[in-house]
Amino acid sequence: MSEGESQTVLSSGSDPKVESSSSAPGLTSVSPPVTSTTSAASPEEEEESEDESEILEESPCGRWQKRREEVNQRNVPGIDSAYLAMDTEEGVEVVWNEVQFSERKNYKLQEEKVRAVFDNLIQLEHLNIVKFHKYWADIKENKARVIFITEYMSSGSLKQFLKKTKKNHKTMNEKAWKRWCTQILSALSYLHSCDPPIIHGNLTCDTIFIQHNGLIKIGSVAPDTINNHVKTCREEQKNLHFFAPEYGEVTNVTTAVDIYSFGMCALEMAVLEIQGNGESSYVPQEAISSAIQLLEDPLQREFIQKCLQSEPARRPTARELLFHPALFEVPSLKLLAAHCIVGHQHMIPENALEEITKNMDTSAVLAEIPAGPGREPVQTLYSQSPALELDKFLEDVRNGIYPLTAFGLPRPQQPQQEEVTSPVVPPSVKTPTPEPAEVETRKVVLMQCNIESVEEGVKHHLTLLLKLEDKLNRHLSCDLMPNENIPELAAELVQLGFISEADQSRLTSLLEETLNKFNFARNSTLNSAAVTVSS
């Protein structure tokens, strides 16, 4: 088993104080121009800036540093305060969220449930969901709080973007609307496929963020576990029309509440704003009905009406909505190829595209569609697909702007809720038992497995990419025999210190699933060509 380790370094993104003048794909730029005139800061402003960057507190591990500056971009039920913080290892800004429990005993009663919920949230790995990094409890003599670190979204909310669009007398681009809806539904489908399902419960245009490249991220997943047992008093929601009618009427809500909220977001994205009663933020049902009637596309109107049905059981699931005619398009070969490249990027050299295209004859024919008698065939030249455009498209696919929804969506890898108390490891029959390595305690947040045939019927080659919770990547590879004992292989990885014991069963399941896929694909192949399968 060979290993390559690399520490992933993330860029800090755009400066939160400067607003990008770029717009989402398919939309006219609506951001105000940035003037080049600058003036010297006054001593009072400099002092205020220094106060905001002052470090108030550190995490127990020393990695996260809380600043004085509060984050006002989110309105999350159950969260008492949110501050800007610094990730000292990655060099990026994050959000330091605090949940205050009224009494220490209240936290103790809920401790196990709180930990289980946050363990699930940290495992979430989706390009369209704001990332949860870490959490810990701070328990004092007479009070307790839970602190958790989330990704910082320096870009504005979707609500802000829609307001700017309306102010500049622009209209919503249909392609952008479809792209945004697809990204949001992809994230909701991922959350709802957890076991048990994770209900967002706070989906509004204020809690959906849009980046300068058109990437959508939903944030503010506030679990009911902290909503119902904290010091925070719930104030009247300013966006009541986003909440399903059954809120407050039933004890246990379902994922259908997120579908209702999504429908309201989709409507607001389409019409830019749903008019309320004058100064009041309350939006009556009549205003919602009027906004729906403004929609010219009957498919779009039906799509939104399905989401806003008063009976929860009649609302479609996020997965079903992805296949609604208003959204669904058969993916192009270009998109399928891009997802294939991105899915195997750990096996492709960084400069592969540049090497392939630098000696290419741009006047050569890339593809040709034959035509009938008397008609010229339709040709596509290499010059019509410049390398820079391909690079940009691959980057957009990698970032999650074009999720592939026509096939099975990625499912969350469920964490092991209870610690494994028995450290018994079956002995390996392939090699002598090695000396015990240093025990790995970090969790694996993402597993990718690839199997390809090397010698037909004799052996295969396994490549495994593991992303640990501290952003460390492990790239492992080995030869795999047709009759390989997968549980023993996973146990050997634990013994060698490559994965934690808590991740052993998850890895075993992934390896067995990928091997079954590989065997099925190989048996279905009519010739002896090499077969490659990834999971």
Swiss-Prot record:
Sites bearing Phosphoserine, chain numbering: 2
The record's GO CC annotations read:
cell cortex; cytoplasm; endomembrane system; lamellipodium; membrane; nucleoplasm
Question: Does the record bear Acetylation in its keywords?
Answer: yes
Residue ranges, annotated region (Disordered) = 1-70, 409-437
User: Which keywords are on file for this protein?
Assistant: Acetylation, Cell projection, Cytoplasm, Membrane, Phosphoprotein
Tissue specificity, in the record's words, reads: Ubiquitously expressed in all tissues examined with high levels in the testis.
GO MF terms held by the record: ATP binding; protein homodimerization activity; protein serine/threonine kinase activity
Q: Where in the cell is it found?
A: Cytoplasm, Cell cortex; Endomembrane system; Cell projection, Lamellipodium
Q: Highest taxon of the source?
A: Eukaryota
| Pfam families referenced in this protein's UniProt entry, alphabetically | Pkinase (PF00069)
Annotated positions of the Phosphothreonine modification: 431, 433
Quote the InterPro entries the UniProt record gives.
Kinase-like_dom_sf, Prot_kinase_dom, WNK_Ser-Thr_kinase
| Residues with the N-acetylserine modification | 2
Ranges of compositional bias, category Low complexity: 27-42, 414-432
**Primary place of residence?**
cytoplasm
For the biological process aspect of GO, one term held by this record is: DNA damage response
Ranges of compositional bias, category Polar residues: 1-26
Similarity comment: family membership:
Belongs to the protein kinase superfamily. Ser/Thr protein kinase family.
Complex and partners: Homodimer. Binds to MLF1, recruiting a serine kinase which phosphorylates both itself and MLF1. Phosphorylated MLF1 binds to YWHAZ and is retained in the cytoplasm. Interacts with ELOC/TCEB1, ELOB/TCEB2, TSC22D2 and TSC22D4. Interacts with the Elongin BC E3 ubiquitin ligase complex via its interaction with ELOB/TCEB2 and ELOC/TCEB1. Interacts with SALL4.
What job does the chain carry out? Required for embryonic development. Plays a role in intestinal epithelial cell fate and proliferation, thereby involved in the architectural development of the intestine potentially via the regulation of Wnt-responsive genes. May play a role in subcellular trafficking between the endoplasmic reticulum and Golgi apparatus through interactions with the Rho-type GTPases. Binding to the NS3 protein of dengue virus type 2 appears to subvert this activity into the alteration of the intracellular membrane structure associated with flaviviral replication.
| Entry note about domains | The protein kinase domain is predicted to be catalytically inactive.
Extra facts: May act as a tumor suppressor to decrease tumor incidence and improve survival. Expression levels have also been found to be reduced in a range of tumor types, such as leukemia, lymphoma, colorectal, breast, brain, esophageal, renal cell, prostate and lung.
Name of protein? Nuclear receptor-binding protein
* Gene behind the chain: NRBP1
